């Protein structure tokens, strides 16, 4: 017998819906450029909001095209490929939208004192963009975790083994 939690599939967005979300972000202003890079990290690499909020320059190895970090939630190390579109979005943010600050966090607020985000603020900006995107949300949560589930669903559709998906998402076990 399954309990209710086990029998429900996590909500997720299709690849087209994720594309629509990304396409709906206004890249004509600094907040949009920043938010696009943040949402791309979540949608394409499956990073948790806490790991995006905590991302530092030292976590990005541009030469080897790798992001290495210690996950906030689990304390476990995680190494992911720095995908070309993700890298380009981060570079665009750093060159054209990031305020001048000595913070070692990649993503900072657009108003002084330019502090880094907390995970709730990252989740909040994802929610705002999901609501503005025009995506049909009935039965789907509007949060960053749903973007992680969406990545997992797409990987499953491409027959990526579950242990590999768990590793990508930084889960401790596949159960």
Predicted regions and their residues:
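Conserved catalytic core of the tyrosine transesterase superfamily
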Residues: 1-175
């Amino acid at each position: 017998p399954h309990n209710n939690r086990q029998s429900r599939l996590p909500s997720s967005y299709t690849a087209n819906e994720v594309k629509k979300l990304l396409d709906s972000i206004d890249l004509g202003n600094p907040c949009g450029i920043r938010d696009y890079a943040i949402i791309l990290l979540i949608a394409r690499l499956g990073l948790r909001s806490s790991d995006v909020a905590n991302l530092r320059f030292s976590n990005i190895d541009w030469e080897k095209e790798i992001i290495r970090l210690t996950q906030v939630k689990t304390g476990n190390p995680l190494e992911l490929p720095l995908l070309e579109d993700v890298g380009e979005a981060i570079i665009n943010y750093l060159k054209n939208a990031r305020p001048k600050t000595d913070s070692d966090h990649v993503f900072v607020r657009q108003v002084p004192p330019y502090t880094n985000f907390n995970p709730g603020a990252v989740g909040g900006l994802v929610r705002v963009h999901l609501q503005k995107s025009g995506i049909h949300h009935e039965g789907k949560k509007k949060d960053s975790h749903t973007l992680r589930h969406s990545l997992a669903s797409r990987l499953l559709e491409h027959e990526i083994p579950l242990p590999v998906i768990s590793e990508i998402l930084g889960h401790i076990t596949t159960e």
